[in-house]
Amino acid sequence: MTADTGGHIRYLMGLVGASEQDPTVERITIATRAFRGFLGDEYWQTRETVTPKIEIVRFPTAQPGYLPKEELWREVPSFADAVIEWIENQPKRPDILHAHYADAGVVAAIVRERLGIPFVFTSHSLGRVKLDAFTRSSGEAMTDAAESLEHRLAAEERALADAALVIASSRDEAEIQYAGYDSYAPGKIRVVPPGSDLTMFTSARSSIAVDRMINRFLDDPDKPPILAIARPVTKKNLIAMVEAFGESPELQNRANLVLIAGSRTDIDDLEPELADNLTRILKTIDRYDLYGKVAYPKGHRPEDLPGLYAYARERRGIFVNPAFNEPFGLTLLEAAAVGIPVIATDSGGPNDIVEVCGNGVLVDATVPRSIADAALDILRSPALWHKYAASGAAAVKAYDWKAHAKRYHGLMRSILSTPSTEPARPAQLLITDIDNTLVGDEAAHAQFCRWLARQNGVGFGIASGRSFHSAMMVLEQEGSPRPEVMITSVGAEIYYLTGDSTTYVGDDEWAKIIDVNWDPDAVNEILGTEPGVHPQAELEQRRFKVSYLTDGDKGLRRRLQEKFAAEGLQCTVTHSHGRYLDILPVRASKGAAVIHVRRRYGLSEDQVFVSGDSANDTEMLRTLPQAIVVQNFTDDMANLPELAHAYFASTGYAAGIIEGVEHFKNRAVTPAV
C-alpha cells in the first residue's frame, strides 16, 4: 500500500469495467498476490467475484505476509508458478495477459515462455524516470533501495523485450522515457491514454465547506487562485510552486496560491518523504513571508475535489501541475472538465493533453520562473483565460473509457489474429500526408476508408511531420486503415508493418544512409543566433530532426540554407505553415524516403502516388510524377513551378486523394491519340 495505490486501483477497475461492456470479452481475471496482515483476512481470500464477467484471483507466494512494493520482486518466481498452475487447471486458458508494472511484466514473460500465451505490458511508471528525477532534484545518485531499483530496471527490460505490445499513456513515455532502455522498440509501443470518468467535474460548483477550508488562510480570498493538487512527494515538485510564487511580487499581487497537498493530522506521523517535503514547503512559505497569500489546508474529502476546482474557476484562477514527470495527468483532465486553464510540466502526458484539449501551456517545471511567467501571461489576458477555459471541454470527449476500450480491444484482436510470415509487397503504393490531407474532414475520411478497402494491390502508407507515435495516435483515433509503411518526422524515420499486422519495425538501413555527415549540435548552434526562432519541446526533437518554431519570416528558409552552406553543413530545411521549422540531414526528406521505400518494394515511379497539402509536402510532391495536391492546400502551392506536373484536385482532404489517384489511373489506361 502506497499513496499511489488508490489511483492504481481506480485505473485498473476503470479498464476492466470498460472491457466487460464488449460482448466479445467473455471473462476477465485480475491476478494478484494473496497475503495475511494488518489489512484483514479479505486479502487472503482465494477468489472474489466482482461482476458476472470479472473475478479477482489471489495467489499465495513464498512469503505469506504483507510486503512493501520494493520487496515484491523476491516473490515473482513463486507467484509465476502459482499462476501457471492455475491456468493449466482452467477449462479454457486466457487468450492474452495484460501485465501492469514491472514485476507483473516478468511474471507474464515467464507464463509466455512456458505456456505460449502472449502478453501486453503497461509500466505506469518507470524505474529510469524515478532515478533521473531523484538525481535531478538532489544532485546525488540514488542509493536507498538500490537493490530494488536494480531489479526493477531488469524487470522492465525483460517486459519490453518479451511483450507482444507495450501500451503507453503518453508520447513522452513512448518516445523519451522508454528510449533509455536497451530493449526499446518504438514500433512495438502504442500510446493509448487512460479513460476518465469526468461527469462529476463538468457541472462542479464550489461549496461552503470548500470556501471555509481555503479562505481562512487568505487576506483577500477574492483574488484568482493558483491551484495545485498533489501528494507532497518529491516527484510532484510542489516546492517549485511556492518558489515561483515567492519570487514574483506581481504574481503575489494578482493571485493567491492554494496547495492541496494530500491529507495529514500530524506531519511527524507521515512517511519520511512526505514529512520532509511538507516541512520544506512550510519553511519556504515562511522564508518569503507568504502568510495571508497561501492556503495549505490539512486535508480534504474525496467529494470535495470537484468543488476545489470549481473554487478556482469561479475566481478565474489557474490549475498548475509542476511535476518533474507526469506519466499521464488525470488532474489536468479534471481541471479541463471544470473549465480552468492549466499550466503543466512539459515532461510526460501533459504534452498530449494540452495538444488535444488546447486548454493551457507547458513549461519546464524545473525552472520556477517559467511557472510564474506562464501564470502572469494568463492572468493579464482575460481573452486568453477564456480561450483556455472554454477549450477544456474537449477532454470529456477525448479521454473516455469507452473510446479507450475500443482502441485497446482492437489492438488485442489484432495481436491474436493469425500472423502472416511477411506482408505481401503491393503492386502500387499510395503515400499521403496525414494532417489536412488524409484527416480533417470526417465524411471525406470515411469515403477514403471505403474506397481503399476496394483497391486490390494498392499498398497504403503515410508521410508526416509527426513522430511515429503521434501519427499512430491520430490514425487510430480517426479509425484510419493501418499503414503498411510509415514515413515519419518529415522523412527522418521509416517504419514497416510486421507480420503480426500490429507492430512496426524501423528501417535501420535508412538510418545509416541519412546519418552520414549529420551534425545536429552544429545546426543548433547556428539556429541559436537566429532571431525569432525558438526550439520546440524536447518531445519534438528526434535523432535526425531538429525542430523550431518561428515568427513567420518568409525569407528564413533561404537564409538558413546560406548559413548552413557557409559552415559546410549539408541539411534539408523545411518551413511550413509559417511557423514550423524542421532541419534534417541532407539525405533525409519525405521525397527521399518515398524513393527509398519504392526501391525497397521494387516499384517503378508510375506505380507510386503521393499526396499532400502544404510546404513540407512540396519536396515529396516534386520528386514523384504522380503527385496529388488536395483542394484545401496552403503555402501558395499552386504557383510553385516545381509542382507544374502535379494534379490539383477539385475536392479537399481525403476526397482529393481519391480524385487524384483515379485521375492518374485513368490517364495510364487512356490510349494516346
Region annotations inferred by a language model:
Residues M1-L333, A337-T418:
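Catalytic cores of nucleotide-sugar-dependent glycosyltransferases that transfer UDP/GDP/TDP-activated
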Residues Q90, A159, Y311-A312, P423, ...:
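Structural alpha-helical scaffold elements that stabilize or flank donor/cofactor-binding regions
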Residues A99, F121, A168-S169, A344, ...:
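Short beta-strand scaffold positions
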Residues A164-L165, E484, P625, A646:
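Receiver (REC) domain switch/active-site residues of two-component response regulators
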Residues P426-A443, L621:
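Asp-based phosphoryl-transfer active-site loop
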Residues A444-E538:
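Active-site phosphate-binding/coordination module
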Residues A522-T623:
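Conserved acidic, metal-coordinating active-site core of Asp-based
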Residues L584, G591-V673:
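Mg2+-dependent phosphoryl-transfer enzymes with acidic/Ser/Thr/Gly-rich catalytic loops
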